[in-house]
From Swiss-Prot:
Cofactor or coenzyme needed: Ca(2+)
Protein name in UniProt: Tk-subtilisin
Signal peptide boundaries: 1-24
Pfam families: Peptidase_S8 (PF00082)
Family assignment from sequence similarity: Belongs to the peptidase S8 family.
Main function: Has a broad substrate specificity with a slight preference to large hydrophobic amino acid residues at the P1 position.
Keywords attached to this entry: Calcium, Hydrolase, Protease, Secreted, Serine protease, Signal, Zymogen
A single BP term in Gene Ontology: proteolysis
Domain annotation Peptidase S8: ranges: 111-417
Record localization: Secreted
One GO term describing the cellular component: extracellular region
Propeptide stretches in the record: 25-106
Source species: Thermococcus kodakarensis (strain ATCC BAA-918 / JCM 12380 / KOD1) (Pyrococcus kodakaraensis (strain KOD1))
Self-association state and partner proteins as the record states: Monomer.
Length: 422
């Protein structure tokens, strides 16, 4: 088995200093996100200034628009337009993570990170294989026929360039990062390769980044909306006010984002709020800059920011400080395209460990009580919410309680599931 080590945040979104062209052939056309008053906004008026609607959000009052650069002022003055925000380019820092690998399937090994979060001792209770529990992974897509993943890929969708597509070719991972992240969450317990934290959980692969690890903030916001709507495209189909954890709905119960950046765009936050209010636990990488605080979207209070540790329980030097919790993120072995396996490191790799633990908590709780736990808040220290359970059961390696290096500590699946079950 070939192993390659790469430092990956995986994907840090940098706010561009200028608007990104809508396409290479339309250098005078830019993409913007328009927050609107739906009662007053007329989408057809956009055509009158030479623009067109790329995507109309269902869950927030906003639209993605391609418009001539010299018409932005006119757009801002249209009835019903409340705010116009320029889209931001997303880039992968460092070399592309297409490292290749052999197709020979090795005998299964349990990666050190899976052991460190104490996942194997939970599998006799649950491996995450509860029909109402799905984890949406917003990333570069997935190798959907990888023998260590295929059985757990329940749905894939791409939102690249504002176009929603469920065609397999559009969902395919041409970078490797997404396949690696998904393997840490849900690689099968099948005697080959590796095994994930929750080896039975269903995965929604939401491709928001292209082969270069490049995408946009608007693509990510659309991806979050798709995770809420689910394969049937309808949030709260039965109208009972319950979305996550409802067997009549197919929204994800967990959203995992191994990406981040410095820009705080209001429409992205609005979509985060929609997911949080739907009862979805949102987990994101804190960042790889060694900065004193997390990047966005991890910095939002509704999101669990994840820092990275190495196998000696040291905080990785690259890991941004002030995470909510920490998890293994150095020398992480997982699945990779072409039926292979690779070793990567970054807060990107720490994040899926936490997402997998959350999936185990919710699966175990649902099996016993027929419902899922509320998400909770950053300050929770009770057994009544997912975040509270993560906090009180974490391995508190720094000063007692929360600290700026480890957060509440390193997540532990076994104690977390025990706490959830009472």
């Amino acid at each position: 088995m070939k192993k390659s080590i790469a430092l990956v945040l995986s994907i840090v979104l940098l706010a561009a200093l200028f608007a990104v062209p809508a396409s290479a052939g339309e250098q005078n056309t830019i993409r913007v996100i328009v927050s609107v008053d739906k009662a007053k906004f007329n989408p057809h008026e956009v055509l009158g200034i030479g623009g067109h609607i790329v995507y109309q959000f269902k869950l927030i009052p906003a639209v993605v628009v391609d418009v001539p650069a010299n018409a932005v002022g006119k757009l801002k003055k249209m009835p019903g337009v409340e705010k116009v925000e320029f889209d931001h380019q997303a880039v992968l820092l460092g070399k592309p993570s297409w490292l290749g690998g052999g197709s020979t399937q090795p005998a299964q090994t349990i990666p050190w990170g899976i052991e460190r979060v104490k996942a194997p001792s939970v599998w006799s209770i649950t491996d995450g294989s509860v029909s109402v529990i799905q984890v949406a992974v917003l990333d570069t897509g997935v190798d959907y026929d990888h023998p260590d993943l295929a059985a757990n890929i329940a749905w894939c969708v791409s939102t690249l360039r504002g176009k929603v597509s469920t065609k397999l070719r559009d969902c395919a991972d041409q970078n490797g990062h997404g396949t690696h992240v998904i393997g840490t969450i849900a690689a099968l317990n099948n005697d080959i390769g590796v095994v994930g934290v929750a080896p039975g959980v269903q995965i929604y692969s939401v491709r928001v980044l292209d082969a270069r690890g490049s995408g946009s903030y608007s693509d990510i916001a659309i991806g979050i909306e798709q995770a809420i709507l689910g394969p049937d495209g309808v949030a709260d189909k039965d109208g009972d006010g319950i979305i996550a954890g409802d067997p009549d709905d197919d929204a994800a119960e967990v959203i995992s984002m191994s990406l981040g950046g410095p820009a705080d765009d209001s429409y992205l936050y609005d979509m985060i709020i929609q997911a949080y209010n739907a009862g979805i636990v949102i987990v994101a990488a804190s960042g790889n800059e060694g900065a004193p605080s997390p990047s966005y979207p991890a910095a939002y209070p509704e999101v669990i920011a994840v820092g990275a540790i190495d196998s000696n329980d040291n905080i990785a030097s690259f890991s941004n400080r002030q995470p909510e919790v920490s998890a293994p993120g150095v020398d992480i072995l997982s699945t990779y395209p072409d039926d292979s396996y690779e070793t990567l490191m970054g807060t990107s790799m720490a994040t899926p460990h936490v997402s997998g633990v959350v999936a185990l908590i919710q699966a175990a709780y649902y099996q016993k009580y027929g419902k899922i736990l509320p998400v909770g808040t950053f300050d929770d220290i009770s057994k009544n919410t997912v975040r509270g359970i993560l906090h009180i059961t974490a391995d508190d390696l720094g000063p007692t309680g929360w600290d700026a290096d480890y957060g509440y500590g390193v997540v532990r699946a076994a104690l977390a599931v025990q706490a959830a079950l009472g």
